[in-house]
Amino acid sequence: MRSLGEKARFDELELLIQNTPIEKLKETLKSTMTRSEGITYWNYLLRGFNPESKDALAKRFECVRSFMDGLSSTELSYKQTFDLITRLSQDLATFPSEQLAWIVEHCMDGIRQGDAKCVGWKDLLPDALSLLLARPRFLLNGISIDGMEFRDTTVRSIATMQWPASILTPIADMFKTMNLSSGEIVTVLNKFSGALQELSPMELPALCFQLFSMCSTASQLIIPLLALEKYFHRNYYKRLFSDMCSNSTNLDSIDLFSDKELREAEETILHHLNYCTMYKLTEKHLAIMLRNFLHMPDVILTPFMLSAIISMTSINRDPESARISHSILLPFLRNVIKNNEEERTLADYSVWYRDTLQRKQVDLQQVLTVLIDQNKDGKDVITPGLVHLVFYLLKSQSPKMHTLAITFLTKFIRKRFIFGQGIIKLISEWMIVYQEQNQFSECLTLLSVADTYTVSECMKPIQSVLEHMQWLSGEQSMRMMNFILPLLKISNRVRDALIDVLCKAMSSSGIQKRRMAIYGFCMILKQLNNSNAVRQTSSATSFCTQHSISGYSIMTQNTLGSRSNPQRNFDMLTLEIIGMLRNCLQQQFDIRCSLYENLQRAVELNAKLVPHVLQVIDWHFRSFFDTPSAEDAGDDLDTVFRIRYDQLVSSSDDQHMEIQLKDNLGKLIQFVANCLAVFDRAPSGYDTREMNRLMSFCVDRMVANRLPLEEITPPATHLKCALVLQQLNIIEGIICHLLLKSKPQNNAVCQILPLFNQHCKLLESLKALSDASKKAHKQLKQTAKNNSTSTCNLTLNGVPVKTMCTQPDNIWDLAILDKLLHLLLDDVVAFAAPEKTVLLRSNEPLVRYVLSVTASRVESIRLEPDYKQLAYSKRTFKQLTDITKVIYERCIQRLPELWKNFDMQSAALATQCFSECLKTAHETYSKKFEDFVKSFDLASIKGSRNKEVVYTIQDVLDDFMTEYGTDDSICKNEFVSKLPVYLLESLEILLDHIDYQDRAATESYTWLLNFCSKNEILNSEMGLVHRMLFVQRQKTHLGPFFDSVARQLGHVLGVQNEDAPSESVELTLKSISTVTIESCLQHLYAAIQKQLNDVDYFVTKANNLNYKCQVVPEIDQIYWRGNLDSMDRSICTQIIHISRTLLVLTNVCIPLGSLMDGLMKLLIQHYTCLKSLTKHYISSYTSDTSIENIKSTKFELLLRAVGKQLPANIYELITYIEANTLDEEAQQHTKKRKVQAERAKVLRETRLIPKVIMVIEDFNKHIILLSKKTKSKNRLTDYLHLGTMRDFDIKSTDLRAAIERSISDGRNISTEDSNAEDRDEDEDENENVEEDDDAQSTTYPEDLEEKEDECLVIEKKEERRRRRAPSSEAEDPQPKRKRGRKAAEQLEAEDEEQVEEEQPETTLKLRRNKKVEPKTKRSVAIKKPEEQPSHESRTSKRSKGPADKQTAEPAKVDLCVPEVPAEKKKPQPSRRLGIPRTLRK
């Protein structure tokens, strides 16, 4: 056979095979299959059968059967099997259908056997099925069947059989080539999704490649991805997250697979996913599918799923050319992360939210940490996309996103520093471009601190930032400078470049630039003492303390001859910088103050600067005092000592109104006092005796009242006011000096009280000048107005100001205030003798003043500019905690004793100060708030028996309300009434940081409920206790509550329907009264709105969960469907509670205005949420099981509670609004000039009514659609309120055109012969119109089901206008008739003289079909042909009457309407507003 085949003698070959017995052929075939020449024999054997001979075909089929049996029993290599099957496939087209069907059945038997070594069927079965697909009908086992039916049956049979795990990959390869339909692909993928859970990691990549290749759409791709996510979570990530959350790891556990195998499999799968989807699926296709999981962070934010999505982004595939702004998946991931963070926040404040969520929120920090660790091991498949995702988070507007991004980048750069330069370059560019956003500079600063070496190597970005600092604003430059400062410790190049930029800024003409230079130089001075650098030089001096950042700057390299003295480097660099700062002492007022502030901070943090700073500041300080030197002076009492106020402030005009403010001596004294205090710790390097002598002179002369002061008595001038402010700051600076030098051995603190008395006198003088300055300023303006030659300019340093006297600004910083508070409040202090502090502690004005200044200073921390970065300042945090501790321990814990035995105003100021401390810690140090509380409240530490701060405040509030709660005089005091308000604000902040699992959270709610139940509040500002009560209620308790609150509001405000059934009011809150009713109502609105927002979020989440139920394998569908039903039940229960609350609120007589608008907005949001829930049920449940699911999820119960009662109350509420809006008697006497204002008021108070009715009707429409789908006996529409509203938002242009056509037709018809007859017919027709109108309103909703589907018509905004009824219409004493066609025409004729006003914007208009549309001429045109003639005759007669009536009646109406007073009747509700017909008269 081989010889004949090789010589192409095929005729002889056919004859040979024909003459050879079949057994011989089978035996030869079986013996040659395993040999290398087996494919040759098989080829010639198949070639030798004549396809036109039946005997040859039968013999060939026997050989094929033997061949197929041999494949199952003989072990062949994959190449041999593939070659043999491929050769057989070439001749399959010549096989009869019955033989092909046998081959298919044999292949299926091979699949059932599950032998991984015999998988030839995977290549043979698809070809055989494709051939059968085109064949005509054939007999199979005696049954006639066509190819398509056989193919579908075969695929269905394969999909339902049990697949052995060993042949899953060949089966997937077979399905990939079978050209399956979309439904079959989904079925097969679901089958594989359940089967792959049992595979080993080494078997997964090959199978996943086949599955990914099989997917042609994104909705198919998500099926294997969800299965793989489940696989890796169960086998790897679940254990990994458990180990990360626990302190110990179970090293004795034996896992099925190693972590290395799982990670390698995951990495390979991600590579296949990227390759298989690169050209088939775009980001847009994936985003359309993935948006169904937008509100399911637990599905998307897992390590595998996150990696899979990132691997399919264009920015990950081609990071060099792809633009991040064109990405679609990265914004999607950002939104998912945002939703997850919102879920974490919402779960902390809602127990219903936590119970409905049924799981914990995703800890994204853990997920990102895992991805960083995997990336560190060399798994770089998703590195570009992951980094750009973090960039998206950084560029968002959410602070939480910024925190996540900065934390990730900090960890990522530490472990993958090779990517550092690219990251630093991009962020630095964004920092320059987006100057109004602070997150970029903050990120660079934290990166610079976390990995200084990596950032210091990015010289090009640093140089670019330094170049831009020269032309950017000063504040922006200071913000950008913060990330460069940590680099100065290890980089001489950066240091010298920064100094060069600062030198240029110092010589700039702009004040902001020079302030930036001062800030930068002082930051350099502050860091000169740090010594953690080794890289800057190779000499031994690099390890010395003072040589840390100094090195050799550009200006000192030429002056140094030896490097053996590192102290010399420090001194020279310091002197260089201070020498440049010395020039600031001769510059403007703002520059000097900025220098004092920044130098003081540098000195406090680097004490070795003090000798150099004192040398510079000494002569400047002496220049403000006129006194002889210490050698020339005699007795101190007789020595001349005077302050040179002309060096501080001067006037450039005779009237002393244009002043020049040169310096602030008080701030200078405070700065010098701090320098001297630091110098006294190590007094060497400079002679400070003269400075101390001048300070002593200031103290002694001021205490003895012998220091000459400028004239500050009225009449007031601008100069006098400025001098008083200077003297106040001088006294404050002297007090700082006394506090800093005070010791138990000296009498420094004894001199504080006389100085404060002088301070109080100056404040009184300033108040007198302030009163006189207003009159003086007014007189000067009048003089300037009368005399053209004189001018009145009130300027400060050339800048016009509005007032002469401004509020004094205290100069004490937090450190001074801390010492003052300890001095005044503590029994014993380390820096003063106890007997010397008695007078100070008993002085009420001093205590009040210090507490007031402390409160304002602590508040100012929150207002500091971003560049100071106080949120990261440990020093400021320590000072804040110290102040809070002394206030809490000495005032708050003893507050009843304080207001009884000392002063009520001081107690109120103490509570204000404590509240400001908590607010500042809450806003500025939110991450450290727990540490902040532990620093002053020792009871918060475990094991302490003291009472926690929350309970302390509650007890103090109880004491205050018991003693003063009913005292009107105390509660009406403008200042003292703030005491309980400040305590409540403090309690609210503390409760905000208490976890819902903490016992204090539940007990605080109980206390708040008791507080509101037993205390009547006389102060409206204390109404915030209701907000606290409502928030804690939602945080800790489930069930109905707010309906009881709404019922009690009805007792205070009154109700519309007294006969409305109401339950007994179990909850009685005395705190709800006429004083607090408005704030309580607003807080109740906020609570209900939060509940509606939560429900709306969960409706969307339920839609996402429903989609997931459709794509998970069947084995998991029961579990997820159970979760969906549970979520639906929880949603319906919550909406029932909300609806009952709104049912009560709509019956309350709420005042019109913002309170009524708030209720209407709640109703709109409520019905919008109900519509979303109804749409969810429409899409989630099939008609077979829907009614059972609807009953089990309480949706039917919800309709019973909401469907009829709430709309009826809303319509009555609309009547109530109209009755209070349209006051007929007031309109009669309204002047013409107030008409427009009254109309605007009416529109403003009724503008939300059409929207409320629209959402109700929209909800009813969706319930009708759901009722049709369920096809249940108990129709859901039976629970609906039968509204009377139809087409309330009609298309005005069509209506106007129809009316004009009717009028023009009526004028062309003669009315002389049949005027009376036509009138009678017109009246009859009008009655018919009314009857049709009534019938129209009663056909809903039963007849509406038989009508055509509604169509949505989009109108242009310019065309949607509505005419307003004229004022005469409201004043018409005649009863109104229902609007038929005639009334509509008359109304249009009267409205043509009025100004058209735009309707509220509504994009989509509901257009009803024939049975619901108004009877206009346009609707007549669609009648049947046989009905049109008679109808047209009726139309011509009907249009005649209105035309005549319009020509006769206008004069009569114009004359009689203004003079006839309207009778006081019950207001007639307008049908335009959708009032129920049962309310009409």
UniProtKB/Swiss-Prot annotation:
One of its GO terms (biological process) is DNA repair. Residues 1306-1481 are annotated as: Disordered. It is found in: Membrane. The keyword Nucleus does not apply. It is a multi-pass membrane protein. GO terms for cellular component: membrane. Keywords: DNA damage, DNA repair, Membrane, Transmembrane, Transmembrane helix. The chain crosses the membrane at residues 211-228, 299-315. Residues 1314-1335, 1342-1352, 1387-1400 have a biased composition (Acidic residues). Residues 1423-1447 have a biased composition (Basic and acidic residues). Its main location: membrane. GO terms for molecular function: DNA polymerase binding. Homodimer. Part of a Fanci-Fancd2 heterodimeric complex that binds and scans dsDNA for DNA damage. Interacts with Fancl (via C-terminus). Belongs to the Fanconi anemia group I protein family. Plays an essential role in the repair of DNA double-strand breaks by homologous recombination and in the repair of interstrand DNA cross-links (ICLs) by promoting Fancd2 monoubiquitination by Fancl and participating in recruitment to DNA repair sites. This is Fanconi anemia group I protein homolog. It comes from Drosophila melanogaster (Fruit fly). The gene is Fanci.
